[in-house]
Structures are given as C-alpha cells and as structure tokens.
Amino acid sequence: MDIHQILKQLPHRYPILLVDRVLEIEKGKRIKALKNVTMNEPFFMGHFPHHPVMPGVLMLEAMAQAAALLAFETLGVTPDDKTVYYFAGIDGARFKRPVEPGDQLIMDVTLERMKAGIFKFKGVTRVGEAIACEAELMCTMRTIA
C-alpha cells in the first residue's frame, strides 16, 4: 500500500501522519509498515535540539496508525468523515532504543482480538533488527455526528 492509498484510509496529515508505506498486510492478522525518520520532522526542533530523538509517544502513534489500517482492511470498510478511530488503551509500553534522524521504523502489528467494536493489537517497532518500542494497543472505531 503506497502513500496515496494510506491517505485515503487515514485522516492524519502532516505533521502527524506517521506511516509512509505498508510493506505487508494479512487481513484479520497482521500488518508491517514503515516510517522514514528524517531530520526534517518538526518534533526534532524541540526534542532535543542538540541530540534529536523521536518522542516515544510518536512511536506508539505510528503503531496505532498501522493498526488502524489493519482494522479497516479487516472490516472491509473505508473510513469517512463520520468514522473516527480512537485509542482506548495502551499496556506494557516499553522503549528500548532511541530513534534518530536517518532511522527507518518498521512497525509490526498483530491483531490479537476483536470484540464488541474493541480491537486489541500487539505492536513492535524496530530499527533494523533492534526493538525500539513495543506495546499492546486497544483501539475502537466510533461513528460521530
């Protein structure tokens, strides 16, 4: 899935769109996506000016965006202006490696369970072979007025 397809699926735009490409997707099972991290990211201006590091919360957000793409594919729906995909919870978040300009984040997200409109995912983000972040994510899709 290229960036044009991602833009049709996710409502996020610059500077918060954190998925550049989907490398693999298995409906109802898993997704593998990537984010190219460059020095041009706006968060590096303040985090930290003399030693730029990607904020951990944005690694979690990148995994959540990949999870949303998997959820939409699994349900066979295309989101619209009346559908919002929310975080419902994060458990066991661990940050194991700093992510710096020039790194490529690979997000591997697995759908663990789907029940009553709540999705539970297991996500691992890597740079090369090294784990940068891992967490369990809970998300829900809601219709808004």
From Swiss-Prot:
It is an enzyme of class 4 (lyase). Coiled coil: none annotated. GO terms for biological process: fatty acid biosynthetic process; lipid A biosynthetic process. GO terms for molecular function: (3R)-hydroxyacyl-[acyl-carrier-protein] dehydratase activity. Keywords: Cytoplasm, Lipid A biosynthesis, Lipid biosynthesis, Lipid metabolism, Lyase. It catalyses: a (3R)-hydroxyacyl-[ACP] = a (2E)-enoyl-[ACP] + H2O. Its EC number is 4.2.1.59. The keyword Nucleotide-binding does not apply. The active site is at residue 47. Belongs to the thioester dehydratase family. FabZ subfamily. This is 3-hydroxyacyl-[acyl-carrier-protein] dehydratase FabZ.
